[in-house]
């Protein structure tokens, strides 16, 4: 991969990690409201904890370049669920565009990983590529 691509992917990785971390933190800080919202769209209350944990922990992992591809898949699945359950009723209203962009960045990270300034090579030294992110 060329350096420009890696720098661009690094920027996507870092901002995506921050966004998901903040959203997960917000869900945990207002868990009662999060559970109520999940119930209002027909999801069981435990899913509020699952989604909040994926966003919070996944955000930290992606920010530091740990398991970027795996977390990218989890983020993409979470966003697909959100788009189907909430956003499809008004596909270009209510900040749905933001979810579409996050879905695309998550898919990009799942497909390409992110090697530049990532911690994967140090944590997963025995892996084939030395990096589960790429």
Swiss-Prot record:
Primary enzyme class: oxidoreductase
GO biological process terms, semicolon-separated: catabolic process; response to toxic substance
Expression triggers: Strongly induced by catechol, less strongly by 2-methylhydroquinone (2-MHQ) but only weakly by chromanon (6-brom-2-vinyl-chroman-4-on).
Subcellular location: Cell membrane
Record's keyword annotation contains Cytoplasm: no
Annotated GO MF terms: oxidoreductase activity
Protein name (record): Putative oxidoreductase CatD
Species: Bacillus subtilis (strain 168)
């Amino acid at each position: 991969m060329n350096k420009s691509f890696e720098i661009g992917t690094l920027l996507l990785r870092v901002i995506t990690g921050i966004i998901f971390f903040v959203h997960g933190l917000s869900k945990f800080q207002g868990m009662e409201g999060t559970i109520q919202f999940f119930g209002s769209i027909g999801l069981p209350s435990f899913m509020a904890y699952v989604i909040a944990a994926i966003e919070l922990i996944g955000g930290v992992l992606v920010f530091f370049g740990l398991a970027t591809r795996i977390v990218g898949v989890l983020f993409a699945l979470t966003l697909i669920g959100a788009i189907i359950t909430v956003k499809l009723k008004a596909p270009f209203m209510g900040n749905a565009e933001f979810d579409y962009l996050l879905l695309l960045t998550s898919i990009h990270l799942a497909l390409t990983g992110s090697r530049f300034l990532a911690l994967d090579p140090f944590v997963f030294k025995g892996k084939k590529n030395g990096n589960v992110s790429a």
